[in-house]
């Protein structure tokens, strides 16, 4: 499984170890546990081959449903890696994604993409299609986003891991890559965000020609806002939750 993951740029996403005695037991106990696990997927209720909802994305929707409930049940804020569909839909409509006409040439970017739910909803509101770009700091959440894209058949989505403010992954030469549309739900009031970005930002997010100033070090909201502005094309549109 690890080799398959690496071949598809999903290294570190699949961490299941079916030889782990501490989790599965030993000998007959392990065999029984694995047999029960396989039996779950043999349940006839999971056979969707005769389902008449041919156009529904059952697997993808089920995956998002599980992520939403995991966030709630685990006590983590859903905003950490999941944006509710209703909020995502409003953001997509606000920036006019329904008017995008250039197909895959249209670019949509989320600088703090989490599990990718906001990007996928933006794509749903773009009838002509688009190319998705996302960056996420947490490596495990990047895995969730990549799986989410695959399950929703967005195989061309470009999801990368890294600190968006201090290590932006989408660049053109020595400048930030710019996009047609940006949607974002960055972490609220991030503390100690100022690292390699420093006071003289090499991407001129804190001002070029007109000095804007460095955002407060103990509150990263403004830093994400300036990153979004700098990552927009001159004719671009953006919506964010701050």
Briefly describe each language-model feature range.
Residues 1-99, 160-169:
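Non-catalytic, mostly N-terminal accessory regions of nucleic-acid modification and defense proteins
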Residues 204-212:
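A short, charged helix-loop
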Residues 1, 212-214:
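Extracellular loop and loop/strand-boundary signature of outer-membrane beta-barrel proteins
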Residues 91, 214-242:
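Conserved Class I SAM-dependent methyltransferase catalytic core
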Residues 27, 52, 134-138, 181, ...:
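Hydrophobic alpha-helical scaffolding
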Residues 77-184, 189-200, 209, 242:
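Conserved S-adenosyl-L-methionine
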């Amino acid at each position: 499984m690890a080799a398959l993951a690496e071949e598809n740029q999903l290294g570190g996403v699949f961490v299941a170890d079916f030889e782990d005695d501490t989790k599965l037991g030993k000998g007959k106990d392990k065999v029984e546990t694995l047999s029960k696990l396989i039996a779950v997927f043999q349940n006839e209720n999971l056979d969707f081959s005769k389902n008449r909802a041919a156009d529904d994305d059952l697997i993808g929707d089920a995956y998002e449903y599980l992520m939403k409930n995991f966030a709630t049940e685990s006590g983590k804020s859903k905003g950490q890696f999941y944006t509710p569909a209703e909020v995502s839909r409003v953001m997509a409509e606000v920036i006019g994604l329904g008017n995008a006409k250039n197909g895959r040439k249209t670019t949509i970017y989320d600088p703090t993409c989490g599990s990718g739910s906001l990007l996928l909803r933006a794509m749903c509101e773009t009838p002509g299609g688009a190319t998705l770009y996302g960056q996420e700091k947490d490596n495990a959440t990047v895995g969730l986003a990549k799986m989410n894209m695959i399950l929703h058949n967005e195989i061309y989505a470009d999801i990368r891991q890294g600190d968006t403010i201090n290590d932006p992954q989408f660049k053109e030469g020595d400048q930030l890559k710019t996009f047609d549309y940006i949607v974002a739900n960055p972490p609220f009031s991030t503390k100690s965000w100022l690292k390699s970005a420093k006071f003289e930002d090499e991407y001129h997010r804190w001002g070029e020609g007109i000095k804007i100033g460095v955002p407060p070090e103990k509150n990263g909201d403004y830093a994400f806002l300036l990153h979004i502005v700098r990552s927009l094309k001159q004719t671009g549109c953006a919506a964010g939750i701050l």
